[in-house]
């Protein structure tokens, strides 16, 4: 991390950012009961700004939390060409954090199965998820923490609407399909711009994201650009949209599984009241 002892302005800004990220992360954890006493939290560390920030903020909160929980960092090395294997172990050893490097050659599997030019996202995601879930069970982790933030959640909402025909996003807390694992997203309330600024000041050893150029990544970038443009033109729109997914009114949507539209009946009592008023 850069030496801020002779740069009071930058030090003040870093402290403000850290306090804001701690407050929002703590609020998300409390709102969704993400971490409980005795939990073993497996923090998934990719080497990007989000997961580095998540690890640091969780360790901050751990030091002052009214409950006891442990943290173990896990990196999934998918054997992508050019991945710098030494960076994360060196960083985590210096930090004094318990960690595991999980080596799974999912890259070769995807390349072998998926035809050239076809999207690899679905298979890659399933293999990655399966590896992490399996390892969480192996080490007895009770929670799996991912570094998705508020902007990721909104981008996923629009991706699912535009390209999947579904009104869904990334929940801050999720039970896996088999009911064995609970996935949490402690940064759910945090802005990407705050995380970006914080990571720059902390000088994390960022591992460049080896984007595969898939259709899903291209679509996500289009949605990201759209949301950033909206926020620039109408400041506060992002906050409003995030508030919207916390204030859902099923009776004003069109999903018959969420609301019994067919069963709606006029209320005789309402007519009686109207008659009384008209008299």
Curated annotation (Swiss-Prot):
CDD domains: TtcA-like. Transmembrane segments: none annotated. [4Fe-4S] cluster binds at residues 121, 124, 212. GO terms for molecular function: 4 iron, 4 sulfur cluster binding; ATP binding; magnesium ion binding; sulfurtransferase activity; tRNA binding. One of its GO terms (biological process) is tRNA thio-modification. It catalyses: cytidine(32) in tRNA + S-sulfanyl-L-cysteinyl-[cysteine desulfurase] + AH2 + ATP = 2-thiocytidine(32) in tRNA + L-cysteinyl-[cysteine desulfurase] + A + AMP + diphosphate + H(+). Pathway: tRNA modification. Catalyzes the ATP-dependent 2-thiolation of cytidine in position 32 of tRNA, to form 2-thiocytidine (s(2)C32). The sulfur atoms are provided by the cysteine/cysteine desulfurase (IscS) system. Belongs to the TtcA family. This is tRNA-cytidine(32) 2-sulfurtransferase. The gene is ttcA.
């Amino acid at each position: 991390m850069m030496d801020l002892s002779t740069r009071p302005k930058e030090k003040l800004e870093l402290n403000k950012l850290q306090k804001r990220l701690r407050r929002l992360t703590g609020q998300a954890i409390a709102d969704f009961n993400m971490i409980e006493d005795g939990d073993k939290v497996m923090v998934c560390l990719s080497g990007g700004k989000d997961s580095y920030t998540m690890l640091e903020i969780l360790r901050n909160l751990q030091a002052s939390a009214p409950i006891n929980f442990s943290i173990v960092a896990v990196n999934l090395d998918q054997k992508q060409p050019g991945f710098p294997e030494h960076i994360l172990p060196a960083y985590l050893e210096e930090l004094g954090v318990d960690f595991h490097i999980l080596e799974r050659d999912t890259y070769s599997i995807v390349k072998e199965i998926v035809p050239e030019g076809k999207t690899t996202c679905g298979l890659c995601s399933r293999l990655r998820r399966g590896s992490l879930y399996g390892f969480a069970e192996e080490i007895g982790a009770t929670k799996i923490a991912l570094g998705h933030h508020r902007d990721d959640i909104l981008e996923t909402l629009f991706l699912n609407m535009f390209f999947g025909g579904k009104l869904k996003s990334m929940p801050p807390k999720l039970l896996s399909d088999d009911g064995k694992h609970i996935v949490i997203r402690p940064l759910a309330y945090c802005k990407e711009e705050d995380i970006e600024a914080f990571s720059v000041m902390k000088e994390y050893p960022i591992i460049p994201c080896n984007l595969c150029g898939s259709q899903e990544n291209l679509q996500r970038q289009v949605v990201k650009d759209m949301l950033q443009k909206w926020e620039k033109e109408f400041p506060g729109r992002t906050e409003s949209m995030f508030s919207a997914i916390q204030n859902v009114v099923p009776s004003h949507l069109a999903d018959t599984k969420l609301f019994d539209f067919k069963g709606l009946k006029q209320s005789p009592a309402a007519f009686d009241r109207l008659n009384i008023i008209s008299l």
